[in-house]
Amino acid sequence: MKICVLPGDGIGPEITAQAVRVLNSLDLKFEMEEALLGGGAVDATGNPYPEATQKLARAADAVLLGAVGGPKWDSLPREQRPERGLLGIRKDLNLFANLRPAILYPELANASTLKPEVVAGLDILIIRELTGDIYFGQPRGVREENGERVGFNTMVYSESEIRRIGHVAFQAAQKRDKRLCSVDKMNVLECTQLWRDVMIEISRDYPDVELSHMLVDNAAMQLVKAPKQFDVMVTGNMFGDILSDEASMLTGSIGMLPSASLDDKNKGLYEPSHGSAPDIAGKGVANPLATILSAAMMLRYTFGLEEQALRVENAVKKVLAQGYRTGDIYERGTNKVGTREMGDAVLAAL
């Protein structure tokens, strides 16, 4: 079981170190190797996704990533920016399915901006298609027309791309509460009418899963109004980008939220949903729990080790129940700890 570890920038090295400690404590035979991605890779090689990293990532079964980016590199040409490294590895490894859970732990109910009764017990999984849609469609650009500039992008999805993400979503729903909500904008976009048609066709293969449909504007509203109506949601790249960020804030701390990006054989890139937080880098105060929970997703989706994944997730729950908190989730009456102490607490709970 080969894991390519990419600590990345900012708080990335601090939080991945704790996830690696957790994985090593499970007595499984992991081979782990570190490489550069993002700003650190630009500084060392001039390339945000260097060749050595590409080789390592392709040879690994899974990739564990900290975070990339920071204001230090904002003035670089676009192709040299750290974020290009992340887009590059996703494309290189054909990672088309992004899974982002939004779970509200009972101990953190007060962290949400919504009333506790609206979010208590929240457990949503948002599945976003990662490689198609308006982000990658051609033609795109800005041109001169009738004496003014005109910007244009192309929203495009093929039937096979929709089928591929649809199967991932239905199979995920089968393992949960067997409810899938597909989000589109079929009333104005032909591209997403096709999306809905294909989802309905696929649903015949999964008679045990209840499929519903929702327009994206209503879905954005319902996520705030009554989020617990959702179990698994599936949508395209742009809508998924927006809705998964919205759902993450229902929980009150993005420092708690893991994510997985998978290919068609369940090889995956696992990373926290938060950024590189350069303002707190090196201070030992970052929350490592999203990265530790990302490692649990790796155990589940790439290695099929459900029991071990649950062990890690239950250890995180136990640590929260014991009152341990990093600064981002701290409230009066709890025990404020740093990055390594939080890692220690999870190891003790394991």
From Swiss-Prot:
Q: Which major enzyme category is it?
A: oxidoreductase
| Cofactor, free-text remark | Binds 1 Mg(2+) or Mn(2+) ion per subunit.
SMART domains in the record? Iso_dh
One Gene Ontology term of the biological-process aspect is: L-leucine biosynthetic process
Q: Where does NAD(+) bind?
A: 70-83, 275-287
Query: Which superkingdom, per the lineage?
Result: Bacteria
The positions annotated as site (Important for catalysis) read: 135, 185
Molecular function (GO) terms for this protein are: 3-isopropylmalate dehydrogenase activity; magnesium ion binding; NAD binding
Q: Which residues does the record give as substrate binding sites?
A: 90, 100, 128, 217
Q: What protein name applies here?
A: 3-isopropylmalate dehydrogenase 1
In its UniProt entry, the species of origin is given as: Dechloromonas aromatica (strain RCB)
Phylogenetic placement of the source organism: Bacteria, Pseudomonadati, Pseudomonadota, Betaproteobacteria, Rhodocyclales
